[in-house]
Amino acid sequence: MPTRSAHTQTSAHSKPARSRARDAIALLKADHKTVSGLFKEYEKAEDAARKAELAEEICNELTIHAAIEEDIFYPQARDALSDDNDGISLLDEAEVEHGSLKVLIAEIEDALESARMDGKTDAKVTVLKEYVEHHVKEEEKQLFPKLRKSGLDLSEVGEQLRERKEEIKAEGMSGLQQLS
């Protein structure tokens, strides 16, 4: 992903154009696409070491994604949709789904730390994929359209998400340990 980091480095010089080009929804959809691609690679992988590597990358990407959604996106979405009962219900469901995803991620990470890339771990990655696909579908088809109409400043929220994501990556995921 050298292109992505090179693009991120130049964003300081072109912040307004970058913000318009990658609002919060665009950033979250890009994350969804990245994780979907990793799951596809995982399904094709035959070597246990490669599967373990991909499972770890999937877990890391999802952990970062969940953190920025929970810390920044969901609270602001909740404020923007405060008069929309369906929107609030979608956010409640998304937060509950995150809880289930975190349990599976923790179980997969425990297995990886114990070097257990077995059938059970493989099944957990498959179930994680199914949960993520369901979660993504609801966000992209139901929640995001509501937020586009809400008046929420998605460019500003996108900038906040980008900054937090960069902080987490710079901290090497250590800042996330206290979130669990």
Regions from the PLM with identified roles:
Residues 1-180:
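Small-residue-biased structural context
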